[in-house]
């Protein structure tokens, strides 16, 4: 079982009409699944776990079932697998980045936290620190550098944007920001940030006294000074609400980003960097 729920009576749709496709073993996906389950009023939501031995067969059978009227794909692998089978029903993507190379769905709940929301959180967390560094992968970024710069300036920040197109250039990109910015925003990017690159990046940030702002709880635990990321449970609930609209024959509306974000601080790293974050200024999870 991926998750177990006590369902709250909120949406009228029959959950058996909704197929949820995901992978077990990913904490963020489990939270999103919990949010999806909380949105339906009765048990019976069908889930295909791609990690199970019968995952591929279960998915094929579920997509062929006449009961299935909408699909929620949780994560990029789930979306790829559903799209590869040419699902004949609407597909809602959750927990998927919406960059230039993102797989397509009929409706999206983007994983991307807007730059305005990130900078707003940093303004509350670290007042007066307005020099914002941004590491951007041109191949994956949803917005061009000039659009990000304009947005940051509108929010009252002085941005320095460095493009980085491959992991081998990540430390060089960080070094280019030394002495120019107060903190560095790292956008979600599985190519740049992974189990091989995170540790040397964190060490370089400590040596260069460049606080990293990560995009997940795991990144903060690994050594980012702070993290700003979606409320994964609420993102799942957003996806369920869109699926329910589709079942009623309504349009899913424009693609949407996270309604709620979460902020975390690595207290030990912040102390090492001399970052006097004001954790009382907004709800913050503190990792010690």
Residue ranges and their predicted role:
Residues 6-288:
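Short hydrophobic alpha-helices and adjacent helix-cap/hinge residues
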